[in-house]
Structure formats: structure tokens, C-alpha cells
């Protein structure tokens, strides 16, 4: 068996494994709900998936937190478990634990170390229970659960859906399906050698803020969806939710917002439950249709890269944005990106990836190294404006999203071997001759 190939060039780290290596997978689920003063409606979890082929070993960790990054997790998992990369995939639930109003991404959050320890524990448990694995993936379109919350108004600019005017009601209670959205859900199914499903990973683009301002801990609709999928498959199946490019996508069903923790008005969790159920139904149906994975030797490839950007308004800002490009079995392409990408970027990338004949999955809100870039609007959305598009002085420069997607596309073709690193062969050869004969009707 050939050794792992590791190439370093221009800030790019490429890792790929020979097809003769056995593909191994491990998974674990750990409750990360801290002991705090807040009431708990439903627990939040860290669900990990480790993939290994030869010397290449990396982990996805889906966390029920708004935004979570940690260099400590990366360091310890590399030293303790030989993990080359840990990708933290935040579901972006707005009802995460918030001690004294602090979010998971804010400095001084007293639960940060606890979260880190629990996530490291999940990765360790995954490593302790590796099994020979087979992987399949698919995607399907179904009636949209979300809408584009940046609604174009009379002056030609867009405003966020919670901004009302003479024509639109705050929070879109009429459930008008504004677009663009991505109505597809993507699914990765991982089986053991007996054909028993062990892991279901769902990839969907929609904000997890149905019960925002509920002043209680909840994993929101992703938590409901994961629970329903796990119940449907049973046998200890673990279900990971990975957010897509849902930066400007809001759920069509939301709960009315409370004004504060002492507000006598109570949060209605029915919209959250129903949205999670609808998503889970599609995921279960798709996962079951995938059936057993092909028996050919699996392949696993990973390429890490980074790009630097400045701010749109504040040119003193420096965003070091790390990207991961993954190809599994030459048929599954994953573009992992940090930040809150707008959905048009996902639609554009997937359209280009269709030409490659692969199942494309964009993992948004997925951090491995570097800075968290916040909202990342496509160029048109940046021009139209609205929340996350032109509000705030810490926004990333215009065009950063397109640059990230273009780099992901180029890195995919580097990984699959089509992108040459030297000039290609010249096709023309001198001396070729032909004779043109007139055609007589």
C-alpha cells in the first residue's frame, strides 16, 4: 500500500489516500448541555464522525451551537488521536445556552472549556469504535421549508424580513416563499460491512432560529430532525445535521418572539417540531432509498486551503479564511466553508459541480482554522443590501464569497487530477492534410 501523499504548495495542504486502504468510520454523540441557570426545553449535543483511510484521518463534529471555533480542540485531537483536521459544524441555533447573555462565540463564555472537553470526548469515542465502512450519498428537492429573508422593497434595496413597511408584515406571517432558496437536502449514509446504517448526515440550508428569543435551551429544528432520523433507523444510528449556505434563509414557520425571560408570553414550539419533522421525513426517505453502498474500494481525499480578505468598509480588517475540499469515492464532493454564506453561492457552486457528475454538498458554518468571517454575501445581495449584506462595519469584502466558491471548484479539480500543475500537451501536429471534395446534389 502506498503511503499517504502530502503536498504543500502556496498555502495548500493536499492529502489523499491510495484506493487499497480500508475506509474506517467512527461516530459518537455527547450531550453538551451545561448546568446553568437557564431552563432547558431540549438538550444540545455534539455529534462526531471520524473518517480514516490509511494515514489520512479527519473529523466532522456537528454541534448544537450558534458559532463555535476552538484551536484547542484541533491541537488536542491532533496530539491525542492523530486527527489531521477537525471540522466544527455549527447548526447555528439561536437558542443555545447563553449564560448572562453571552453566546458561544463570545469571549468570556464560562462554558467554552466545557464545550471543548465534551467535543474532544466525542472525537475520542469515535476513534475508540472505528469500523470498516461503506459510504453513499444523494440529494433530493422537496417543498421549501425556508424563504429568503432579504426582501426587495420599493426603493430597489432589500431589507430583512423583520422590518415591516406598508406592503410587508414583520416576520412574514403570510409565509410568502420569497427566493432564492435551495430546496434540496443532501444526505450521506454510512454503513458497516453488514449493510447496517450507522451514520446519517443531513445537509440543509436554513437558519435555526425558529424559537429565537425563547430564553430556554433548545437545539431548534435541527435537533428535532436528528432525533426523528435516529428514532426511525434505531440500532444506535447517529444523525449529524450540517448547515448549508443559510446565511439569508429563514424558516417559513417561526414562533412569536418573547420580549424577555420574564415575559408572560410563552414560546410556541410547534413550528419548530413541525419543521424538524418535515425535514426528517425527507431525510429518512432519501437515506433508505440509497440502499447499500457499492463494494468497490473506497477513496478518501482532503485538500486544505486558505484565502485572505479585508473588510468591505473597514480596510484594517484581515480575514484568514480556511477552506476544506473533500472527495469521497470519487462521487461525493464536499466544500466546507466557515461563516454564514448566502444561498446564491451554494446554488452557483452546485450548478458547476453537476458538470463533474458528483453529489455536491456545501458545508457552511464549518470552521477548521483561521478567522470566523461572519456573513458572506454574494455580490448581488451585497449590492441590494439588508441584514448581513451591507449592515455593519465588520463585513467581509465584496466578492469574497465568489472567490471562496471559485477556489473550492478549482481545488476539487486539483484533487480529482484534472487540474494540471504544468502546461498541457500541444494537440496540433504539423503535416496533417485533407482534401475537400464538392458535394453534388
Name each region found by the language model.
Residues 1-22:
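Bacterial Sec-dependent N-terminal signal peptides
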Amino acid at each position: 500500500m502506498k503511503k499517504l501523499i502530502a503536498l504543500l504548495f502556496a498555502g495548500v495542504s493536499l492529502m489523499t489516500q491510495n484506493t487499497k486502504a480500508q475506509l474506517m468510520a467512527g461516530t459518537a454523540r455527547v450531550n453538551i448541555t451545561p448546568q446553568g441557570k437557564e431552563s432547558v426545553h431540549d438538550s444540545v449535543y455534539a455529534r462526531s464522525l471520524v473518517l480514516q483511510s490509511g494515514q489520512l484521518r479527519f473529523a466532522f463534529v456537528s454541534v448544537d451551537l450558534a458559532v463555535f471555533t476552538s484551536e484547542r480542540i484541533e491541537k488536542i485531537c491532533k496530539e491525542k488521536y492523530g486527527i489531521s483536521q477537525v471540522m466544527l459544524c455549527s447548526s447555528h441555533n439561536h437558542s443555545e445556552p447563553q449564560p448572562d447573555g453571552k453566546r458561544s462565540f463570545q469571549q468570556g463564555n464560562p462554558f467554552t472549556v466545557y464545550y471543548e472537553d465534551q467535543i474532544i470526548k466525542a472525537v475520542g469515542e469515535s476513534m475508540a469504535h472505528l469500523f470498516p465502512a461503506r459510504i453513499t450519498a444523494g440529494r433530493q428537492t422537496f417543498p421549501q421549508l425556508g424563504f429568503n429573508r432579504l426582501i426587495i422593497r420599493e426603493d430597489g434595496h432589500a431589507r430583512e424580513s423583520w422590518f415591516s413597511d406598508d406592503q410587508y408584515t414583520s416576520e412574514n406571517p403570510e409565509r410568502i416563499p420569497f427566493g432564492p432558496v435551495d430546496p434540496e437536502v443532501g444526505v450521506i449514509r454510512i454503513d458497516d460491512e453488514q449493510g447496517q446504517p450507522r451514520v446519517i448526515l443531513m445537509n440543509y440550508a436554513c437558519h435555526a432560529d425558529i424559537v429565537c428569543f425563547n430564553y430556554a435551551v433548545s437545539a431548534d429544528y435541527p435537533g428535532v430532525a436528528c432525533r426523528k432520523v435516529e428514532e426511525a433507523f434505531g440500532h444506535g444510528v447517529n444523525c449529524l445535521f450540517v448547515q448549508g449556505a443559510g446565511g439569508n434563509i429563514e424558516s417559513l414557520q417561526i414562533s412569536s418572539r418573547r420580549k424577555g425571560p420574564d415575559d408572560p408570553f410563552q414560546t410556541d414550539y410547534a413550528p419548530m417540531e413541525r419543521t424538524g419533522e418535515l425535514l426528517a421525513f425527507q431525510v429518512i426517505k432519501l437515506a433508505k432509498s440509497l440502499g447499500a453502498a457499492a463494494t468497490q474500494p473506497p477513496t478518501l481525499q482532503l485538500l486544505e486551503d486558505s484565502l485572505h480578505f479585508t473588510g468591505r468598509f473597514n480596510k484594517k480588517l484581515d480575514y484568514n479564511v480556511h477552506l476544506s475540499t473533500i472527495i469521497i469515492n470519487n462521487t461525493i464532493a464536499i466544500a466546507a466553508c466557515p461563516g454564514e454564506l448566502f444561498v446564491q453561492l451554494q446554488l452557483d457552486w452546485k450548478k458547476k459541480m453537476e458538470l463533474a457528475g458528483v453529489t455536491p454538498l456545501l458545508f457552511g458554518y464549518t470552521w477548521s482554522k483561521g478567522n470566523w468571517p461572519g456573513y458572506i454575501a454574494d455580490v448581488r445581495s451585497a449590492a441590494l443590501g439588508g441584514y448581513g449584506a451591507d449592515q455593519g462595519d465588520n463585513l467581509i469584502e465584496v466578492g469574497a464569497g465568489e472567490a471562496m466558491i471559485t477556489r473550492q471548484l478549482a481545488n476539487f479539480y486539483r484533487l480529482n487530477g484534472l487540474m494540471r500543475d504544468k502546461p498541457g500537451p500541444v494537440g496540433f501536429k504539423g503535416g496533417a492534410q485533407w482534401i475537400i471534395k464538392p458535394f453534388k446534389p
